[in-house]
């Protein structure tokens, strides 16, 4: 499946990729306040939920942003809110920040993780909608996206009542269908292999696996543990990577064009180089080898 097979012209919704990326200029530093973290390989210190990070400044900017990795806060450079931060700050709470009211702050801290999950679902649904292979379920995908958008636009007290688990289950059902449709499209284009079975590594333990130059086209890698896996020069075109743990995976020279349900969070946690090929919707991390 080639990048050109992403059919943007038939999308029925008005969501754009930029709506699903962090806009820190319009956020009240929610990821630096609402979320907890503990001392680990990703964080040099611990912080409880609802406690502002010691590096958060009065203007909601990070005081060590340019040196986060050097300061032991690699986890901060990996995180992506999918646009939930600015939605909560500017839409849900109408530009009134958490410093103005302790009661409002508590609600905001609880709303943010829910909004984060909903926006992540929007990312996946938006991607599925522009895939030509998923044209047969496009109407249902669009209806589910519209419902997800509606949930993100509820009042704060209503968002807290959303059954995220049930909604995610419905979204996941459609994403699974999309994944299978993409695989059928891939299989049709494999010369002489029209009956080839899909490589299934769903939830597999592939930590540290030696997969250099592996042919993983269209593979099901949903939820696979690929921590520190050697994926140099691997062919991952059209592979389903939703939920795959790619921390410290080596993607130097790998081809991930057309891979589906891959997010910036996952890519930010990997190693890569100038020859790593990514889907157009994703950015090359600053820490990758030039």
Locations of the language-model features?
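Hydrophobic scaffolds flanking metal-cofactor catalytic centers in soluble metalloenzymes
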Residues: 2-189
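Tandem repeat scaffolds
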Residues: 186-290
């Amino acid at each position: 499946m080639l990048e050109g097979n992403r059919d943007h012209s038939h999308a029925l919704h008005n969501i754009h990729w930029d709506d699903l990326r962090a806009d820190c200029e319009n956020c009240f530093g929610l990821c630096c306040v609402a979320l907890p973290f503990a001392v680990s390989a990703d964080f040099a210190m611990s912080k409880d939920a609802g406690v502002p990070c010691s590096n958060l400044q009065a203007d909601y900017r990070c005081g060590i942003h340019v040196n986060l990795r050097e300061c032991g806060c690699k986890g901060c450079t990996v995180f992506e809110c999918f646009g939930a931060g600015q939605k909560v700050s500017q839409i849900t709470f109408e530009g009134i920040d958490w410093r103005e009211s302790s009661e409002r702050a508590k609600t905001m801290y609880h709303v943010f993780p829910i909004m984060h999950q909903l926006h992540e679902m929007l990312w996946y649904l938006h991607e599925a909608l522009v895939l030509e292979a998923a044209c047969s379920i496009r109407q249902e995908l669009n209806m589910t996206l519209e419902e997800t958008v509606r949930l993100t636009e509820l009042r704060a007290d209503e968002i807290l009542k959303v059954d995220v688990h049930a909604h995610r289950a419905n979204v996941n059902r459609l994403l699974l269908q999309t994944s299978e449709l993409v695989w059928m499209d891939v299989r049709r284009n494999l010369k002489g292999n029209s009956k080839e079975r899909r490589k299934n590594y769903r939830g597999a333990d592939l930590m540290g696996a030696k997969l250099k130059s592996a042919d993983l086209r269209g593979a099901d890698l949903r939820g696979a543990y690929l921590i520190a896996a050697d994926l140099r020069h691997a062919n991952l075109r059209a592979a389903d990577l939703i939920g795959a743990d790619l921390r410290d995976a080596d993607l130097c020279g790998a081809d991930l064009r057309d891979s589906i349900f891959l997010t910036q969070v996952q890519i930010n946690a990997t190693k890569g180089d100038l020859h790593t090929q990514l889907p157009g919707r994703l950015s090359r991390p600053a820490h990758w080898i030039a």
